[in-house]
Amino acid sequence: MGRLDGKVIVLTAAAQGIGRAAALAFAKEGAKVIATDINDSKLQELDKYPGIHTRVLDVTKKKQIDQFANDIERLDVLFNVAGFVHHGTILDCEETDWDFSMNLNVRSMYLMIKAFLPKMMAQKSGNIINMSSVASSIKGVVNRCVYSTTKAAVIGLTKSVAADFIQQGIRCNCVCPGTVDTPSLQERIQARPNPEEALSDFLKRQKTGRFATAEEVALLCVYLASDESAYITGNPVIIDGGWSL
């Protein structure tokens, strides 16, 4: 018996990084996973794994999300992962950067939750997990102005949904990682003028001396998706190797 046997789980940004690791971990524990991403070619790599079904989805497009929600008969867990990390202070953040980050990191979760929550309410049960970050209202981080702002908003959204719908059988939590070794992180390091120095800077702030792995974060997500965490709601759950201490 898997820890997620019989559960239907929808997640976004499943083609790589934490989303991919979570999709695989959910399926391994017996869930029926509907993995979505905008990147069709990378997403298709998940089709070979038992228990995982894929669907191309742009989480910034309301029409696509509403159609997707209409196609899903039942849903136990919604895991909102999609997001973007902008590098810079407020002076480096143009209005286009601000709008893009808000749209992908916050509005997409609003759209997904609003589309799928009525289905959960009709079932009188549901579990929503949002991807936030330690770089948020939890910790001020250099050069993460708009990113931290969006992730603080995710914590606020999470607490609001949890408070509003707890009596309807709905739980809502968010995962707050520190620095995780993902393709996104490696791309950001390589984009810096001195990648070697950037890597060193990232590692220096890790009290454990290493990054988290996507698989470690995925194991926390399995716990939050399972009935083992049934008494947990409205919480930003930190997994950061002590970075926020």
UniProtKB/Swiss-Prot annotation:
EC number: 1.1.1.-, 1.1.1.30, 1.1.1.104
UniProt-listed InterPro entries: NAD(P)-bd_dom_sf (IPR036291), Sc_DH/Rdtase_CS (IPR020904), SDR_fam (IPR002347), SDR_superfamily_enzyme (IPR051122)
Binding site for NAD(+): Q16, G17, I18, D37, D58, K151, V180, D181, T182, P183, S184
Pfam families xrefs: adh_short_C2
Pathway assigned in UniProt: Amino-acid metabolism; Siderophore biosynthesis
Residue positions of the active site: Y147
Subunit: Homotetramer.
Function: NAD(H)-dependent dehydrogenase/reductase with a preference for cyclic substrates. Catalyzes stereoselective conversion of 4-oxo-L-proline to cis-4-hydroxy-L-proline, likely a detoxification mechanism for ketoprolines. Mediates the formation of 2,5-dihydroxybenzoate (2,5-DHBA), a siderophore that chelates free cytoplasmic iron and associates with LCN2, thereby regulating iron transport and homeostasis while protecting cells against free radical-induced oxidative stress.
Protein name per its UniProtKB record: Dehydrogenase/reductase SDR family member 6
Gene: BDH2
